[in-house]
């Protein structure tokens, strides 16, 4: 299964063999049988990649990644050299971009999911038992990873 990050560690604890393929390789890997399933993005992105042509089940919710954060990284010295006005422009532009991206993304998902159903994709939901199992394994992974000082600092 294509998976990444802590979610991959959870799936491995549940007996799943995971692979961290780049997004552009998912379709081909599914088509060739190199992987049987994939976690990736949201329904609109799945549609753009054509995943409905090869994957016939889509499970919700995405328990491992409740949101995606876009970021703009600016060198500290470059930031310090900017005027307060330019810093404010950049901050507000980023906020507006995030707001727009979230709103557009959420607005289009229902139509995209309806289209996926028309293309034969079954929309399924994880049972409460499966979500509890994911949570239990997630907690185990976090305890193990917390032995690393940097992980512990970031996670807490």
What would you call each of these model-derived segments?
Residues 1-156:
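N-terminal secretory/targeting leader peptides
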């Amino acid at each position: 299964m294509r998976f990444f990050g802590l979610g991959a560690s959870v799936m491995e604890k549940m007996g799943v063999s995971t692979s961290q393929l780049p997004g552009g390789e998912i379709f081909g890997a599914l088509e060739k049988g190199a992987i049987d399933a994939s976690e990736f993005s949201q329904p609109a992105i799945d549609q753009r990649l054509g995943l409905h042509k090869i994957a016939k089940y889509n499970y919700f919710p995405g328990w491992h990644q409740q949101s995606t954060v876009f970021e703009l990284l600016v060198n500290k010295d470059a930031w310090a050299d900017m005027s307060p006005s330019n810093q404010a422009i950049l901050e507000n532009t980023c906020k507006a971009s995030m707001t727009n991206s979230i709103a557009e993304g959420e607005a289009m998902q229902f139509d995209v999911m309806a289209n996926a159903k028309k293309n034969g994709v079954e929309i399924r939901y994880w049972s409460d038992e499966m979500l509890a199992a994911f949570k239990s394994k997630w907690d185990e992974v976090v305890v193990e990873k917390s032995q690393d000082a940097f992980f512990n600092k970031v996670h807490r």
